[in-house]
Swiss-Prot record:
The active site is at 216 (proton donor), 290. The keyword Cytoplasm does not apply. Its EC number is 3.2.1.-. It is found in: Secreted. Glycans are attached at residues 36, 64, 77, 140, 155, 236, 251, 315, 356. The gene is rhgC. InterPro entries: Glyco_hydro_28, Pectin_lyas_fold, Pectin_lyase_fold/virulence. The lineage of its organism: Eukaryota, Fungi, Dikarya, Ascomycota, Pezizomycotina. This is Probable rhamnogalacturonase C. One of its GO terms (cellular component) is extracellular region. Residues 1-18 form the signal peptide.
């Protein structure tokens, strides 16, 4: 959100993100791009009947407006019958005010946006959506294409629309820099794995005000990743906010999670198995948990053995956590670090986690050094001994863990299409979204006669 029309707000927002390394978001605001050049897909042959393929219309509109302009998808239902790639954009935007629906069976992703700088993908009326009809695959234990991939894109934002019922993953942010992702709703089948909502690797990223209901991870950090602020995240029946899985060459640092609300989801699951590299300088604070299976977990024996020396994990802080796991049969705090490279400099502060079905909980630490819970203290960071510590806690902690009115208490269906719900107005108890939803009328919010519209001639 770095557009020139809001310099003071953006400056203050940047200061608020202590883990960010610099400004994020597009360099030029969407209204300026729309005023410069607008390409309405209707003028390129698109029909809002939910049946006619818009792939060529969208490609042609992008071809004319990918440098300095705005592609406009007006209200209505549109069928996308081919996977498309929109690439080489410079100071451009896509305004999604309608619903783009999967109209084919692809294998990669419906929309790939690649190699762009100063880019914005947003809904001007906060009613835009990408509809994947994923249940058609998932009910048969098969998978289809991802909905959206943002690849090698710098100085950008994605905001204000819904991604519904993906046949696979929802959004992948691949090798991205200085981006802001916010006011996003992701909803689909909640009983099937390999349906990650947001996977991201890159530099200097701000994610905020996002709600996810799916069958796998919610907002997941992959390697390499540096300088992220992830806040006001509502995982509403989901795997939760994870790091990993991590292989060889891992390089993750300076990630700040805050204001996480987990309904039947895990707030921290860091996972690897004999990879290598580093994970350091990570903060999780202000976390509310209602019913996750592993609410606070490091598992360095997870998944396939990568055959290396282990990922070095250090300087992690868990602060102000409240709530309960789904069952006392699993530890509410489980820090299982690699015996060859123990974790160190871990702080657990004011973490109050209980269990729904019990009068006790378990803390379990393996090869994890620091302060709090079952951690072992250490004077230095070299030659750390291996150990296992398991503690049973019977004193019920005193805490307040409010709930959200929209919490799901049942799995969402896998045999019927999803309706597109309105955009949420809250993503964490008591917190107002950082950016208000847009309510624009027309391309860029400009009067209909203002933009220079480029039309394709039909013969």
């Amino acid at each position: 959100m770095r557009a020139s029309i809001l310099p003071l707000t953006l400056f203050l927002a940047t200061l608020a993100g202590a883990q960010l390394s610099g400004p994020v978001g597009p360099l030029v605001d969407y209204s300026t791009k729309a005023r410069n050049q607008t390409c309405n897909i209707i003028d390129y042959g698109a029909v809002a009947d939910g049946k006619t393929d818009i792939s060529q219309a969208l490609l042609d509109a992008w071809g004319n407006c990918s440098v300095g302009g705005l592609v406009y998808i007006p209200p209505g239902n549109y069928s996308l019958a081919e996977d498309i790639e929109l690439k080489h954009g410079q100071s451009s935007a896509i305004q999604l005010d309608g619903v783009v629906m999967r109209g084919h069976r692809g294998s990669y992703q419906m929309i790939l946006i690649r190699d762009c700088n100063d880019f914005e993908f947003f809904s001007g009326n906060s009613r835009g959506a990408i509809q994947g009809f994923g249940y058609e695959y998932l009910q048969n234990d098969t998978y289809g294409e991802r909905l959206l991939r943002i690849q090698e894109v710098n100085n950008f934002s994605v905001h204000g629309f819904a991604l519904i019922d993906s046949p696979s993953y929802y959004i992948v942010f691949d090798t991205v820099t200085s981006g802001e992702v916010y006011n996003i709703l992701i909803r689909g089948v909640t009983s099937v794995g390999a349906t990650d909502a947001i996977d991201v690797w890159g530099e200097n990223m701000w994610f905020h005000d996002i709600e996810v209901s799916n069958g796998d991870e919610c907002v997941t950090v992959k390697s390499p990743a540096h300088n992220y602020l992830i806040e006001n995240i509502y995982c509403n029946l989901s795997g939760g906010t994870a790091i990993g899985s991590l292989g060889t060459g891992t390089n993750i640092s300076d990630i700040h999670y805050r204001n996480l609300y987990m309904n039947q989801a895990d707030a921290c699951f860091l996972k690897s198995n004999n990879g290598d590299g580093i994970v350091k300088n990570i903060i999780w604070e202000n976390v509310i948990v209602h019913g996750g299976p592993y609410p606070l977990a490091i598992d360095e024996a997870w998944g396939d053995d990568r055959g290396s020396v282990g990922v070095q994990v250090s300087n992690l802080t868990f602060r102000n956590w409240h709530g309960e796991s789904v069952s006392a049969s699993r530890p509410v705090i489980r820090l299982q670090c690699d015996s060859d490279v123990p974790c160190y400099d871990i702080t657990i502060e004011n973490v109050n986690l209980w269990a729904n079905d019990s009068n006790y909980v378990v803390w379990q630490c393996e090869n994890a050094y620091g302060d709090g819970a079952c951690l072992s203290s250490a004077e230095g960071t070299k030659d750390l001994e291996t150990f296992t510590s398991k503690q049973t806690i019977t004193a019920t902690p005193s805490y307040a863990a409010p709930t959200m009115a929209a919490d799901f208490t049942f799995n969402l269906p896998s045999t019927s299409p999803f309706t597109i719900p309105p955009m949420p107005t809250s993503f964490y108890p008591g917190a107002t979204p950082i950016s208000t939803l847009l309510h624009l009328h027309g391309a860029g919010g400009l009067p209909s006669a203002s933009p220079i519209s480029h039309h394709r001639r039909h013969q």
